[in-house]
Amino acid sequence: MVMFMVFRILGRMTKIEKEIKEEEAKYDLIIKNEAKIEPIVAEEDMEFKQGDIKPIRIKKIKIPPMSVLLICPYGRHRVGHVVAVGEEVPMPIDVEREVDMAMFACGFEGEVKKGDLIGMLLILAAEKRE
C-alpha cells in the first residue's frame, strides 16, 4: 500500500511539473514589421536515400531574442527539404539562439555537399503582448 501511495504522489508531482512547464512555454506574441531571410547552408557532406530524414550540420545562424522562425517551403535543393532547424540545447524564445543543425527530409536519392544551399530561414521579430 505504501508503494502505491508513493507512486501516486510521484505521478501527481510529475503531472503538476509538466503543466507548469507547458504554461511557461506559452507566449502571446505580436509579430513586428521586421523580417530577415538567412540561407541555410550545409556544413558537411551527407548521402541520402529516398525517404531518409536525418539531421545535418549547417553554418551557424544567430537568432535574436524574441524572434519567430519560418522555413521557406520553396525547395532549394534537388534532393530534399529542410523541415526544422535547431541547436543541441533548445533555448527559450526570449534569449539569443544560434541554430547549427537542420532536419533534412529526402525526396530523392542523392548527396548534399558542404556549402550547398539547402533552404532559407525567415526570421520574424516579435514582442510579447502585454
Swiss-Prot record:
This is Uncharacterized protein MJ0614. It comes from Methanocaldococcus jannaschii (strain ATCC 43067 / DSM 2661 / JAL-1 / JCM 10045 / NBRC 100440) (Methanococcus jannaschii). It holds the Pfam family DUF22. It comes from the Archaea.
